[in-house]
Amino acid sequence: MSAPVLLIDIGNTRLKWAWCNAGEVAVQEPGRLPTPWQHSGAVTHTDDSAMNTLAAVLRNLRGEGPVPSVWITNVAGPVIAGQVDAALNAAFGDGASVQWVRSAAAHGSLVSGYREPTQLGVDRWVGSIGAHRWLPGETLLIVTAGTATTLDIVTAQPGGQGRFEGGLILPGLALMLAALARNTAQLPALDVEDTGTAAASRLPWADNTHDAIAAGCLAAQAGAIERTWRTLSERGPTRCLLSGGARHALAGALAVPFEMHDNLVLLGLHAMATA
């Protein structure tokens, strides 16, 4: 990289970003996913001051150096896209080269098996690119625990190729908890952070309403992951990768082996930017 690279993942709730210094080479431990950036952060994009904060941080990171190339995924719509464009202009002027990534039928050695490849959520596609880039030749169950929880399947193909097979989408843990509180008369409202006791319990049920809600929502999430993992594992070795803002809450509830990564979408953007 002759110039820095800025990676931006605009999700439904938060904007996550990572800054890769020019000339830095990603180092991977054998069989593990790297985190090939030197600075990273996140803002809640519904916060009125979020874009000003982002612009100030990026301006400081650049300093007197060259303008970065920018790679972005966005699932939050055109309004936030315009706000991010304005923040980038505030940080770098109009000199930044910005790539708004879209889903496609293939990228490198990964082929999309989606019925309509361009209709696949770009976050799911790019996250799969990132995982496959560093774990070629492996069948992967990629779990992203965010506003929605997505399960995406990449199967190993001959010659190190990969195929995105499809996946599942279900309400995220926070959405499940909020739906119960909103649509019932007497059940309390819980946050994702309130599920820790249920996740640590040796029993899959609870003796109080608070923990019963947490245990039920965790069981729904974990059950989808474990069922999919078992189905894939019947065909051959499968690695489960867990990412997203609620990954730590889900981690305590899973009964299958998994590996965590901070942000697979940013990892996929890095793979595309450095291809």
Swiss-Prot record:
Names of the cofactor(s): NH4(+); K(+)
Pathway(s) served: Cofactor biosynthesis; coenzyme A biosynthesis; CoA from (R)-pantothenate: step 1/5
Record flagged with keyword Transferase: yes
Active-site residues (renumbered): D123 (proton acceptor)
Main location: cytoplasm
Domain of life: Bacteria
Catalytic activity: (R)-pantothenate + ATP = (R)-4'-phosphopantothenate + ADP + H(+)
Pfam families recorded: Pan_kinase
InterPro entries: ATPase_NBD, Type_III_PanK
GO molecular function: ATP binding; pantothenate kinase activity
Family statement drawn from the similarity comment of this UniProt entry: Belongs to the type III pantothenate kinase family.
Entry protein name: Type III pantothenate kinase
